[in-house]
Structures are given as C-alpha cells and as structure tokens.
C-alpha cells in the first residue's frame, strides 16, 4: 500500500491500493466516468454505509455536470483506469452524502430517484421532511462526519462515445430538447400510443424540474419553467386517463391546483378523473369551477355532466341488480340446522357479504382535447 498522498485539496487524503494502467485519462467536460465505490465511516470497525458491488451496479457520473457530491469528481480525475484508491474526506466534503446515498439506494431498489413531480430539490426536501427514510442516513444528516471512499475506476468514455441521457445534458441543451420531447409526446398521443407519449412528457418534465432547482422560487424564470411544467403535467395526466390510472391523475392535478388554483385545464382533467371513480360531487364541483373560470367551455362541461349522469345511473342500476341477486340467493338457500347442543356464547354477527364491486369501466369521452 502506498503512503497517503495529499491531492492539494483541503480535507482530502488519497491512498493508492492498486495501481492503474496507462496514462491519466483525458477527463473533459461531458466525459462519462464509470466506477465502483464503497463508503465507510471512520470508526474502528470502518462501518460500511454503501457498496456498489453488493448491488452489482457500477456508478457513473458526467464530468462538469454539477454532481451532487462534487468531491467525487476531484477524486476520480486523479485516478487511472483500473486503479483502486482509498480517499479520506473531511466533513466539508461529505455533508450532502446522505442525500446522494438515498438516491443511489432508491435506484438499486428500482425506484425513481428523480421524483420529477416534487416541487422542491433534494436539499430542500431534506429540511422539509426531516428524514431520508434510512436510520443510518438520518444519523449522518444530523451529525456530519468524515467518510472514507474506496473507489475502483472502471472506464472513462469521451462525450462522443456514448448516448447521453437528457439528465446528462447541459442547461442550454435541456431547454432545447424540451419542446422536441413535448412535440413528440403530442404526436404519439394522437396515434394512441399513450405509454410512449407519457414517457416523453415525463422526460421533458424531469429536464425542466432540474433547471428549476437552479432558479429562485417564484421569480420570473422560475415561474416561466413552472408554467411549462404544468402544461406538460396535464398532458401527462391525459395519458394516464387513457391508461385508466385515475388516482394518479387526481394526485398530479390536485398538486397543481394547490400551487396554482386558477388553471382551468387542471380542474377539467381532475373532473374527468373524479367521474371515472364515481366521485360525483367532486366532479361536479370541478366542472362548475371550469365554467366560472372559462365560460367558453360550457359545451364541453355539458357533455362531461351528461357522461357523469349516465355513469352514475349505470352504477346505481348495477348496484340494485347486485342487491336483488344477493337477496334472491339468500331466499333460496335451505335453513341451517340448529347446533346439536346449546351454548352460552353470544350469537355471531350476521355477515352482509362482500362489498359490491364497481361496474366495469366505461370508455373515456374522446371529447375536449387539452394537448398543446
């Protein structure tokens, strides 16, 4: 093991455990760096916090892309391919590690770490919710401490050697790709390819959310991005309506209206979702709000009210038939024999049978198009 090497960076010490091959790679902006890592505490047991090899999932970052844990870019750009090195990093570099670790664990579990529908960035969420969902990370968050990173550099790719995902793009590139994704989503929606369309809208939303975290909330540029996000989210919700994912529509539209109570289309889309799950009063209230804010949509609102009335009538008729069938089945069953011996226990409560299942879903109205 080589002696500890200072990287000329305050609060960082490096120890090479296994030498790499070749020259130092050409780390330029946009280079993709792939590596395995293990994170440990500086206690006597060197307690392991995270280990990418345990989930068989190498990590990668893009140079110059403002990675959450900036010190990792410094560490990696000091290494050769196949080198294994241990880095001691002081608290000034490790304060945001719990947030990064949470995202990595979510990815390993197959969850979406971007949480694109959340209005605040990761750092703000940390203070808003007070917990990261993992006891060890909450402890690190509460009491930041130096950490040890053991890193093995596997591969370095030039920007032209790989297909860049949208989240890897620069801010300027993200702004340019959003209208492209938006237009592609609209095209796919018109073709009835709702799953693909929803993916395009979601990808555009992720880009805009990322850009929005760099702006001051409620100022002009932030609000401009927010308006674009809301438009895309409502288009995404229309895909969800077509896929019959009504409760997710209710979640997204309600979130929009909590922050922006004057968006007509959010009320309209939410009304349609309420109607699909037989929330009659809520659907009517939202449609009434649409009329108050946009009287020119009276024709569309009347159509939705007729559909709602038909759906509720069909539901009531099906429930009447179900009850009638249950009563007729009960009347034809032979009486049960009394028990052989009397007992003193109180009689069991009579079961009313399983709750009525909702009727089959009716087809959605082709009605009012809200695509942009």
Swiss-Prot record:
Q: What role does this protein play?
A: May be important in protein trafficking and/or protein folding and stabilization.
UniProt subunit comment: Interacts with NUB1.
Q: Where are the TPR repeats?
A: 178-211, 230-263, 264-297
Where are the stretches annotated Disordered? 315-372
Q: Which residues form the PPIase FKBP-type domain?
A: 53-145
- GO cellular component entries: cytoplasm; nucleus
Sequence ranges of Pro residues compositional bias: 335-345
Question: Per the record's keyword annotation, is Cytoplasm included, yes or no?
Answer: yes
Primary location recorded for the protein, binned into one broad class: cytoplasm
Which InterPro entries does the record associate with it? AIP/AIPL1/TTC9 (IPR039663), PPIase_AIP (IPR056277), PPIase_dom_sf (IPR046357), TPR-like_helical_dom_sf (IPR011990), TPR_rpt (IPR019734)
Q: Which UniProt keywords apply?
A: Cytoplasm, Nucleus, Repeat, TPR repeat
What Pfam families is this protein classified in?
PPIase_AIP
What are the GO MF terms of this UniProt record?
peptidyl-prolyl cis-trans isomerase activity
What is the organism field in this record?
A: Papio cynocephalus
What Gene3D superfamilies is this protein classified in?
3.10.50.40, Tetratricopeptide repeat domain
Superkingdom, natural source: Eukaryota
Q: Where in the cell is it found?
A: Cytoplasm; Nucleus
Q: Give the SUPFAM superfamilies listed for this entry.
A: FKBP-like (SSF54534), TPR-like (SSF48452)
Q: What is this protein called?
A: Aryl-hydrocarbon-interacting protein-like 1
